[in-house]
Amino acid sequence: MRKIIVLSFITLDGVMQAPGGPEEDTSSSFKYGGWVSPYFDEVADKVMEKQLKPADLLLGRKTFEIFEGYWPQHSANWPGINEVTKYVVSGTRETSDWENTIFLRNLTDIEKLKNGSGTDIQVHGSGELIQLLLKNDLVDELWLKIHPITLGNGKKLFAKG
């Protein structure tokens, strides 16, 4: 059985939306993209280096499309990103030119993936997918990088409940 590990940058008020850049995810008029940048330094780089070891990825479609448009051309910053298998949960997409991409349709496909053999599976971004995984008790570990900032609004890691 494989472990599913969620890696996420979050704020003190639980926002996980668009940590990397202003254009990353502007849905719902989110204007704080790139909020993690002021907190990156050599220590953070070393932590990320260890966490970005080669592991298969499980991504929601929206996050995949952001990754697909960026990482193939910037793979020096994430060694192995092009070689690992990228499992994408999508009801609309079926193909990608990005090597080693496999599309999954539903929860049953995710459960089969988890119950199979192979490396750990990392989830990055993918807020809606994370909610589905948490609701169905499929997350084995949460690796959260909590930053000392509050944004007041944005997509949250933990849904209200």
Where are these regions (language model features)?
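Enzymes that bind and transform nitrogen-containing heteroaromatic metabolites
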Residues: 1-161
